[in-house]
Amino acid sequence: MIIALASPPIAVSLDDGLEQVRAMMAEAAAQGAGIICFPEAYLPGLRGTGNDVPPFDAGDEAKVLKAVAGWARSSRIATILGVEHVTDDGRQIAAVVINGDGAMQGIQAKCQLDPSEEQYYVPGHTRQLFQVHGVPFGIAICHEAFRYPETVRWAATRGARIVFHPHQTGGDHAGTTPAHWGDPAAPYYEKAVMCRALENTIYIASVNYALARPESATCIVTPSGTCLASLPYGEEGLLLHEINLECATGLLATRYAPERYPA
């Protein structure tokens, strides 16, 4: 299966972001990808990061999902879209999964917020396993996979062969960009992604924005913990790669024995 990871720049408006999504979906489909994943809260943008976020309400959310569902259907590509989900309790950071026929498969809200995000968002309270072309996958959003390994293991122990990891690290004005993938002198983010893959024997597809000063790459990490492919830091575009699902056995995830650790 070929997967596509989309690294667009931060959208300057909702319409600009939608055009980026449309173009990248079409390009990924033309290159044979079965699924495409966008960064964390791409529409309308992630609050609290120093960037202006366009106004966004439930009507805007409905407009976005209708448009993206139509493009998924016309391009025949499943899509994981990082969005802001408007609920009665407040705004959530979420990822919406849309099938290649345009039907919504489900939504994964970010359950473990970074402490700095709590003034802007409310957490989700459920987790979901998804499928594309019969392949089970999970979603862990940014801080969840970086700091809470349980969010990835939850999916891996339930059969996920890959966990998609939409995130944002660094920015256009501040950030420490690694010299190379896994750079020991750089922030811990890429090393954490490597651990999530290795400790569960699954693929991790980690998706960042195209930023001037990113602190982690858009990359695919194999079940053995090696970087299969990555985009150059700060480069806008698509990372497309075929993954070997036979390698994603989930062996180490299924060997976890919680009964050996009594409360």
Task: State the predicted function of each range.
Residues 14, 22-101, 169-198:
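Cys-nucleophile CN-hydrolase/nitrilase-fold catalytic domain and related Cys-dependent amidase chemistry
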Residues 81-83, 94-97, 128, 218-220, ...:
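Short beta-strand scaffold segments in enzyme catalytic cores
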Residues 87-186, 191, 247-262:
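Active-site catalytic loop in hydrolytic enzyme cores
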Residues 7-14:
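Short polar catalytic/cofactor-binding loops
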Residues 1-4:
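Extreme N-terminal starter segment of soluble prokaryotic enzymes
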Residues 60-80, 146-236:
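CN hydrolase (nitrilase-like) catalytic-core segments centered on the catalytic cysteine
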